[in-house]
Amino acid sequence: MIKTHNWTEQELIVVFNLYCKLPFGQYHKGNKKVIELAHILGRTPSAVALKLCNFARFDPLLQKRGIKGMQHGSKLDEKIWKEFNHNWEELAYRSEFVLADLKGEKPYAEIEFEQEQYLMGKEREALVKIRVNQNFFRQLILASYRNRCAVCLLPEADLLVASHIVPWSVDVSLRMNPKNGICMCALHDKAFDKGLISVNDDYELIISETIKILFKEPSVQRGFIPYEGEEIALPDRFIPDKKYLEFHRNNIFIP
């Protein structure tokens, strides 16, 4: 039965979950994932699509592009947006559990645990949370960059990584913040992680002298030199925070 009453907080949480996982431009009633979620919630695909667009209107980057939802959208929409953006760690995890419960599944059904049989209690619960959130973060970052490397535009998802700008080991509170993420291919992710490349405040790629001295190598000429000084491909939403990029340049990048 199709619902017509007001949206609940639980429903909006799972709609925002989908908002994070779909590339911008796919928030429409004909999208298979929109239709699937509408069926789960007992809503029409049009209603779910409209909620997705309403969430988009809160994103500062999309606001600059003139993206608008309903002029008088629900205050609860804004509440959910703010809650996620203030606490990605908990809300992402909660949204995965709510969605899994609605589908009658385990939130970690598709996630493999190498030593799961040896874990118990809080230790296992903590690992589950980390893995569930890692999976969510990856989907969010890849979708925001339309499944392309920000440096070379490689479009193969199996070769893409949701790179953290400020590493987990430095600030665990940022590990789920999408503004602390960049989608990169495996090559450029490793170079970024090792400080061989970075990004300036104009979102242009900078390359370490460690790489530049190898400029005669064909692999370096193909994989790095063409992108130096070029603006990286920016995401449709959750643009990298400049203060995180500054941290990377000052603490990880090798000039």
Language-model segments: residues:
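Short helix->loop/beta-hairpin flanking segments within DNA-binding domains
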Residues: 19-29
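Short alpha-helical "recognition helix" segments of helix-turn-helix
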Residues: 33-38
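Short, charged surface segments at domain edges that flank catalytic/cofactor-binding sites
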Residues: 110-148, 154, 166-179
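Short, Lys/Arg-enriched anionic-surface-contact patches
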Residues: 1-18, 128
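Short Lys/Arg-enriched helix C-cap and helix-to-coil transition segments
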Residues: 60-80
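A detector for short metal-coordination/catalytic motifs
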Residues: 136, 154-157, 167-255
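The −1 position to Zn-ligating cysteines in a subset of zinc-ribbon hairpins
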Residues: 44, 148, 161, 184
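Major-groove recognition helix of helix-turn-helix-like DNA-binding domains
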Residues: 43-58
